[in-house]
Amino acid sequence: NTTAVNGEGGSKYIDAARNVVIKDTVKYAHLPIKHDFKLRGTLVFQSSGEPVLLNDKPIVVEKSFTAKKAEGSIDMEFVFDASGLQGKKIFVFEELFYENQTIAAAVHKDLGDVGQTVTVSNPKVKTVASNKVDGSKMLEPDKRVTILDTVSFSGLIEGHTYKVSGTLMDKATGNPVVDESGETIT
């Protein structure tokens, strides 16, 4: 029995960011006591079973342990860059070996197991700016106005804190708009 979750909060979602953590808890049973084992976990894409790569190498974590009881659990943490993986489902393959053996004593590679799957968030943001007075897109030149920017979003991770900030941009030039004192309008 295994469970993969966000290592920083326990949800089934991780941010599309650098240095994210997937915590994989592997529960075992019927192991011979006082024997040495090695647990190997590999991150793969659920859609294909192909490994998730970091610097062109599969992301693999190995952990050695001695079974103190026939039943127990082991945690493994995978730290990696998920910034380009928005919307992807990541699965953890596990293999259990007797120490110094090359053939796995137990394998868990069922891509359909939702307990082993973590989804990389795919946040979307949309803004609609309008004249606060009448809701139109028209502003009077040379008059002080307030622009209301309505922000809508989806795909955020529940329980995470996000910050919304904006800068008024000149559509024609692509440059920030500045006020009479030269300050960028935010």
Q: Model-derived features: where do they sit?
A:
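Solvent-exposed loop/turn and edge beta-strand elements of beta-rich ligand-binding domains
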Residues: 1-186
